[in-house]
Amino acid sequence: MERFRRYLKGDISLWGVILFFALLSFLPVYSSSSNLVYLERTGISTRGYLIRHVGLIAAGLLIIYLIHRFPYRYFRPLARLGLLLSWILLFFALLKGSTIEGANASRWIYIMGISFQPSAFAMIILLMYVASYLAEVYETKYSFAESILPLWLPVVITLAMVTLPNLSTGAMMYAMVLMVLYIGRYPIKYILGSSILAVLLFALFMLVVKAFPDAFPHRVDTWKNRIETFMSKDKEENYQSERAKMAIVSGGFWGQGAGKSVMKNLLPQGSSDFIFAIVVEEYGLLGGSALILLFIIMLVRFVVISMKATTIFGKLLVLGVGIPIVFQGFVNMGVSVGLLPVTGQNLPFFTTGGTSIWMTCMALGIVLSVSAKSVKSEERKVKNEQRSEVSEQRSEVSEQRSVNSEQRSDIDERI
């Protein structure tokens, strides 16, 4: 155990949860990939998709390890550089991005043959930047006008480029920004004012899109159709949602067994948006509940690590990059059970795709970097306490020796 602790720093419970997620993802991904083999017809077998997923997980764990060894104080200057890089990637995706799995918006770019979704990277960087700004002004008084350029301008630029091709990610990103602002003691009146302004700007954007539909093809129609489909009682329109519910019901308490899902062949997005339904069908309510419990444990560890962090930046950074992982997981599960409209949000570790896994691992590496510093501080505190105890014991021994010598001298005088 000591050998592992020498290399794996930070919260050991979070490390355990991460490894559980990684191991539990293999069988569902292997099972659900049979539908990908049929739909994509690329010549890759289910075993090939499993090997690919194992490789992505292995690379993700390496990302966690490398980042968690990096002192998190260096993330503050890197956040500004990362923000510029994310804007370049987002702009390139808007201009020359590709569509994957039927999406009608350019969300992906290819780097060395690997598909990459810049919005996932942009979310982590933006929340890191917001945490850095709030840490800088934490003890100072400032007006809303003074925070427009350093805070809101980067937020608006990032959200604008993310929301156009991906409304659900943009909405989640804005919600996470507001959460970090609230925890970082940004004045509530400024938060409310900016939220009202955001609603007005979004309404104006919708009017512009309606007035010039050729400039923004299909986007408003897609958002509208998803909401209407969710509200509709027509089972034909709710094809995927209905099949997902059927998969969950057929799973029962114990499930059909690993690889025995029937609905995976009827769900076009069974390996991504609705993979939780496949998990419940094969492993039952018991397996689905275990997955939910893992997300809850992960959330608890994020809160504990944040409370133990020794700096304001560390506290905000953990919650800023950590909570979106849990939030994204619950949104994906909510879509599968029919509580939410289809959003396109991934189930961390389970959804096929390198971007989802690697960006999740990047965020977890940042959290563990903060945790490693806290653990190191605690270890130093314990060592200092032990040293003080040893010094006190030594002083007591020396005092006892002096008392003994005095007693001996008294005895010698009497003799």
Range-by-range predicted roles:
Residues 2-18, 75:
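N-terminal membrane topogenic signal
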Residues 248-286, 313:
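Long extracytoplasmic/lumenal interhelical loops at the membrane interface
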Residues 166-172, 256-258, 270-272, 340-343, ...:
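Transmembrane helix boundary and interhelical junction motifs in multipass membrane proteins
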Residues 20-34:
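Alpha-helical transmembrane segments of multi-pass membrane proteins
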Residues 30-46:
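Inter-helical loop and helix-membrane interface segments of multi-pass membrane transporters/permeases
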